[in-house]
Amino acid sequence: GPLALKWNYVPKMIPWFLRFIRNCSTKRMMHTAKNMHQILDLALPAYDELFEEINLEGLVEKKGILYIWNDQNLKSRKLEIKIRNELGVDQQVVTPKEIHDLEPNIKPIYHGGVYYQHGRHARNPKKILLKLFELFLKKGGKFLKMNIQDINFDVEKPILKSENQSFIFDKIVIACGSFSKRLTDNLDEKIPLDTERGYHIHFKDCDHLLSRPVIFQNRGFGITPMEQGLRVVGTVEFGGLKNPLSKLRIKNLINNAKYMMGDLPEHEDEWLGFRPTLPDYLPVIGPSKKHKNIFYC
């Protein structure tokens, strides 16, 4: 299934789960949806502003994103469509025939879907990131790779401490994703941050089989055509940052990909990513409540 637990990590997740349950009311869910919509509505214009300064030829495609499902979870899908309509999201409900016309290589496992025609996808995120990194250096940015172990203060100025060096700054931004908690805990800022472990595999030289990202909502996974082939991603696994990769989760992705696409070659590039997650599913963006010169992102 799309959700998995590492049982040795469950005791540590109990406070997070209790907070999550408190955020499952209709009122709290709508609060999250409205605020996330406001944030995501700014995402593409913000990317466009950055992309004006780098050459993205062939790295980003504007072919939309397709969500599909079968009848098993139709009630949930209708609620999602209703909420997005209320928020003004540009979405097109599509029939099985329209899904086939968009993506003829998908097996007929679906009964309906939604097409987001303005969606985009990256053909190679690493290449895009390296181009942005080069732009950062060109504009005078400096990059130091080291293990930051603690944050102290000189009056109000934050001091970053590594194993054998210290750096004093006027202001700092903590933007370490799921790993940020190691630093925020040292600041006595009890942010209920944890991680959703997501799995990835590639099927090399198969990107021609799809034109755009396709997400099968019943099983909680998606497939995106990329330079490396078809990237299959999905599942939410609660297990922290230290547990090893689960081969069962990889097998689950392989089976799901073949369930959607039929015969595929041997997969490549098994890897695990750590998505930061909070109980209300809203990000932490802005100044620290306790330290005015520290910002979170």
Write out the residue ranges for each language-model feature.
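Central helical "cap/lid" subdomain
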Residues: F153, L160-S211, D263
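Conserved FAD/dinucleotide-binding core of flavoprotein oxidoreductases
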Residues: M226-M261
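C-terminal catalytic lobe of FAD-dependent flavoproteins
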Residues: Q91, Q217-N218, K258-C297
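Helical element adjacent to the flavin cofactor pocket in flavoenzyme catalytic cores
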Residues: K75-L87, I99, I106-K171
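Short beta-strand to alpha-helix junction loop
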Residues: H31-L44, L66-S76, D101-L102, Y115-E134, ...
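A short coil-to-beta-strand element that immediately follows conserved catalytic motifs
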Residues: V60-K62, K145, L193-E196, M261-G273
